[in-house]
Every structure is written in C-alpha cells, then in structure tokens.
Amino acid sequence: MSDLDTLLMETLAQVAFAADEGELENVRVGALGKKGTISALLATLGKMSPDERKVQGAAINALKDKVNEALAERRLILKEQKLEARLAAEIIDVTLPVLPRPEELGRIHPITQVMDELAAIFAEMGFAIAEGPDIETDDYNFTKLNFPPDHPARDMHDTFFFEPDAQGQRKVLRTHTSPVQVRTMLTQKPPIRVICPGRTYRCDSDQTHTPMFHQVEGLVIDKSAHLGHLKWILEEFCKAFFEVPDVKMRFRPSYFPFTEPSMEVDIQCSRKGGEIRFGEGEDWLEILGCGMVHPNVLRNCGLDPDVYQGFAWGMGIDRIAMLKYGMPDLRAFFEADIRWLNHYGFRPLDMPSLLSGLSS
C-alpha cells in the first residue's frame, strides 16, 4: 500500500469519526489547510521532474477530491443529525395541557363575531353566503352596476385604482361588495337569495371612516320579489341583530345607480344619557341603504327584467358593530390593541345562534 493510500484511509477515518461540524472543520484544516498534510504533498511537486510531477500530481489531486467529497457527505449528515436533535428537543406533546400564558384565552374580534351573527340571522331566512375577490375589474365594480362614466366613485380621490394593464384596463380595490352580487347573477339561475360580506376599500379616513372597512350586502332575485318582502327582511334582521322585541323603521327616498327606487333606512332609537337604545325613543338613526334592483343591472347580468325582479341592501358591518356594542372609534378596530380586544372581544366558543342568543 502506498503512502497516499495510507493517508487517504487515515483521513477518511477521521472524517467518519468527526462528531460535530467543529471537529469536521479541524479534520479539513489538518488535511487541506495551508499547513495540511495534503497541501504539504502538493508543495513537493515543484521539486519533482516533469514526468514525476505528472504522475504524482494526478494522484494527489485525486486524493484531494476524495477527501473533499467525504467532507461534504459528512457535513450533510451532521447537519441532518443536528436538525433532528433540535426537532426532537422542540417536540410538542399535544396531549398535555397548555402551559399558562399571560393571555390564557384569545378573543374573537368584534368584526368576526358580527359577521357570524349576520350569517346566523340570514341563514334562518334561507340566505346563502357568496364571496368574491377584493381586487375587481372596473366592469364588475362600476359598469355592470349601472354607474355612469362620470360618477364621482370613479374618481381617483374616492377609489383605489391599480396601474393600467397591457390592455389599458385598470383594476380597483372593490368599493363595495356589490360585484359579488353581479358574479352571483351571472353564474346562478334565479331564484337567488344571498348575502355578500367582506372587506371593501375607499379613500377615506377619520373617526368613523377607514380606508378599509367591512360591508354586507343582500340580494334577492325572483319573479315576484317586491318591497314588502324587503321591508319584512330588514325588520326581522334589526330585531334579531339588536336583540329587541320590536323596531320601527322609516324608508326615505334616495339614489343609488344600481337600484330603482332607492331608499335609505332609519331605525327608531333613544339617545338619552349619551347611550343609543333601539326599539324605543323618538330619534332616528340611518343604518343602511336599499332598493329594487335596477332593470339595467338585471340586463347586464343576463336576466330579463320583464321576467325577474329583485331587491338589494347594504350596510357597514363596522358601523352596526359600533352601534350594537358601544364602540366610539372605528380606527380602534384595526390597531391590534390587546386591551381593546379583551374589553370588546368575544370568547372563542361563543357561536352566535338565534336560539341561544347572538351575543350571549
């Protein structure tokens, strides 16, 4: 056995027995470092004849390559062993009780709670939930909803527009959840009965407005849907949501591009002592907008307005949450203040239902 074979066996043995990356690095330096054994052999090549240098150079380089290969393999094994040891040390036994934390229980955000309340109320009336993308086309957000080209909502100061695409079309962050109604009418055949909750976006920010907020809209399409049905649905919703035995509502004429006639709805309330109470008093508070779906919207969605008609409504989820639970500032909803959430949040297992109470 030649000296090179002996050196290779000894070096490979040292590599194999290296217990960690530190020991492996010492082996590498001892063999391939500036003063290493293999480096020393390479330094002797200059004293050899050309023929000897050719033979010995090839042999020493082959030795060096084998050592480098062994070092790389061992390094990979050691890294895997280190990872396995760390994972074993960090394993969590899910059968054991959770260790105490400063916040022993999380809280459900009021917006999530109110969305669940809305779903529970309208599910009892036979409504399904429809959802759509936050980023919408101008066609779905405006055109199919009968917005005229010069409507203020199409202005940059009111709507978040994206840069035009290659075809020159601009997408928007949806300004309402009405595009979900459009998508529903385009993909489903009547009768339709859905609510559309979700995030919406507008260029506005103050104590009662934020650039992102939450909205729920409702849509009913059928051959005989009329304002009487709309009035009953909204009255039943308000009684269930605000948990009062009776409510008085008034419908005021208004204008929305996508409904005709259009109305805004006020609910009777009392403001005594700085507290708003529904179902009593002599004051009125606006809570939502509604109306019969405009014939142009039906046509844009492939429905014959001579056969089908329907109604729709929309309200701010953040706003009705503030009214029901006495929250004075909308901006606090998005500040992630654990103290605020502990005060206004809900227990995780409190699932709203009309039978057990929405906010019990």
Swiss-Prot record:
EC number(s) on file: 6.1.1.20
Keywords on record: Aminoacyl-tRNA synthetase, ATP-binding, Cytoplasm, Ligase, Magnesium, Metal-binding, Nucleotide-binding, Protein biosynthesis
Binding, Mg(2+): 260
Gene3D superfamilies for the chain: Bira Bifunctional Protein, Domain 2
TM ranges: none
Cofactor note: Binds 2 magnesium ions per tetramer.
Cofactor: Mg(2+)
Enzyme class (EC, first level): ligase
GO cellular component, as recorded: cytoplasm
Subunit structure: Tetramer of two alpha and two beta subunits.
Family: Belongs to the class-II aminoacyl-tRNA synthetase family. Phe-tRNA synthetase alpha subunit type 1 subfamily.
Protein name: Phenylalanine--tRNA ligase alpha subunit
